[in-house]
Design a protein with these regions (language model features):
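Surface-exposed, low-hydrophobicity beta-strand/loop segments enriched in small/polar/acidic residues
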Residues: 1-97
């Protein structure tokens, strides 16, 4: 999944107050210089959360992995993965954890 503008982000929309844990990993390409990175995010409320931030100017971000788990005991949560380009939000997938 490519994020190619400074407005592109990946977000998670969670439906309930569950213990949602997210790991994202990516590589940035800035004029041929490749830089790996990652981010861990803990979500504990029903909210919209950016889990992969936008790349810098003149940089393309290639998201290599997005791992989402529900560590709650007994609380299910509907999770939507969305791409926001600064104007439009597109739902990429939705599932119940």
């Amino acid at each position: 999944l490519l994020l190619t503008s400074t407005a592109d982000v990946l977000r998670l929309v969670t439906s309930s107050a569950a213990d949602i844990q997210v790991h994202a990993s990516w590589v940035d390409n800035a004029a041929g210089t490749i830089t790996p990175a990652r981010q861990n995010t803990i979500i504990s409320t029903a909210t919209t959360t950016t889990v992969v931030p936008s790349p810098g100017a003149s940089t393309q971000r290639n998201v290599k992995g997005l791992y989402v788990t529900n560590n709650s005991t007994g609380t299910s949560c509907t999770v939507a993965v969305t791409h926001f380009d600064g104007t439009n939000t597109v739902e990429l997938m939705q599932f119940v954890l």
